[in-house]
C-alpha cells in the first residue's frame, strides 16, 4: 500500500513539473516576441520595432503609439494626440505634437517646431527654416483671435 501511494505522489509531481515547464516555455516565448515586436495594446512598452496602442512607448525604429505615444529613434511617428516626435524625421502628433530633431514636422494643431521644421497651426518655428503657422492675420502679420475680431469690426465700420 505504501508503494502505491508513493507511485501516485510521484506521478502527480511529474505532471506538475511538466506543466510548470510548459508554462515557462510559453512565458519565455512571449518575452522573446515582446522584445522582438514590442508593444502591447494598452500601456505597451516599445520594442525594437513597435509601440503600443495607447500610452505606448516608442521603439528604436518606427515606434510610436496611437495616443500619447513616444517617438522613436528613427522615423518615430508621434502619436495621434500629444505625440512626441523622433530623432530623425519624427512626425509630431495630430494635436500638440512635438517636432523632431531633423525635418520634424510639428503637429496639426499647436505643433511645436523642430530642429528643422515647423507646425501647421500655431506652430513654433524651428532652428532652421522653421515656418510657424499663422491662424489669424491682421494687416500682414500674425495676431490673436481677439485682435483679429477687433480689427475686422474696425475695418467694417470704416467701409
UniProtKB/Swiss-Prot annotation:
<keyword id="KW-0346">Stress response</keyword>
<keyword id="KW-0677">Repeat</keyword>
<feature type="repeat" description="5">
    <location>
        <begin position="91"/>
        <end position="102"/>
    </location>
</feature>
<dbReference type="InterPro" id="IPR010800">
    <property type="entry name" value="GRP"/>
</dbReference>
<dbReference type="InterPro" id="IPR052872">
    <property type="entry name" value="ESR_Regulator"/>
</dbReference>
<feature type="repeat" description="7; approximate">
    <location>
        <begin position="124"/>
        <end position="135"/>
    </location>
</feature>
<feature type="region of interest" description="7 X 12 AA repeats of G-G-G-Y-N-H-G-G-G-Y-N">
    <location>
        <begin position="38"/>
        <end position="135"/>
    </location>
</feature>
<feature type="repeat" description="3">
    <location>
        <begin position="63"/>
        <end position="74"/>
    </location>
</feature>
<feature type="repeat" description="4">
    <location>
        <begin position="77"/>
        <end position="88"/>
    </location>
</feature>
<comment type="similarity">
    <text>Belongs to the GRP family.</text>
</comment>
<feature type="repeat" description="2">
    <location>
        <begin position="50"/>
        <end position="61"/>
    </location>
</feature>
<dbReference type="Pfam" id="PF07172">
    <property type="entry name" value="GRP"/>
</dbReference>
<feature type="repeat" description="1">
    <location>
        <begin position="38"/>
        <end position="49"/>
    </location>
</feature>
<protein>
    <recommendedName>
        <fullName>Abscisic acid and environmental stress-inducible protein</fullName>
    </recommendedName>
</protein>
<feature type="repeat" description="6">
    <location>
        <begin position="105"/>
        <end position="116"/>
    </location>
</feature>
Amino acid at each position: 500500500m505504501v508503494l502505491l501511494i508513493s507511485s501516485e505522489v510521484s506521478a502527480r509531481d511529474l505532471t506538475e513539473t511538466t506543466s510548470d515547464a510548459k508554462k515557462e516555455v510559453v512565458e519565455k516565448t512571449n518575452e522573446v516576441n515582446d522584445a522582438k515586436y514590442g508593444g502591447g495594446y494598452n500601456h505597451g512598452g516599445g520594442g525594437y520595432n513597435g509601440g503600443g496602442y495607447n500610452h505606448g512607448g516608442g521603439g528604436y525604429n518606427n515606434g510610436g503609439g496611437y495616443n500619447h505615444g513616444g517617438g522613436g529613434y528613427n522615423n518615430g511617428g508621434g502619436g495621434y494626440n500629444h505625440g512626441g516626435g523622433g530623432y530623425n524625421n519624427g512626425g509630431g502628433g495630430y494635436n500638440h505634437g512635438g517636432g523632431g530633431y531633423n525635418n520634424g514636422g510639428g503637429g496639426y494643431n499647436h505643433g511645436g517646431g523642430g530642429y528643422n521644421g515647423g507646425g501647421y497651426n500655431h506652430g513654433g518655428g524651428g532652428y532652421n527654416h522653421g515656418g510657424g503657422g499663422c491662424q489669424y492675420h491682421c494687416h500682414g502679420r500674425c495676431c490673436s483671435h481677439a485682435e483679429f475680431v477687433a480689427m475686422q469690426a474696425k475695418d467694417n465700420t470704416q467701409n
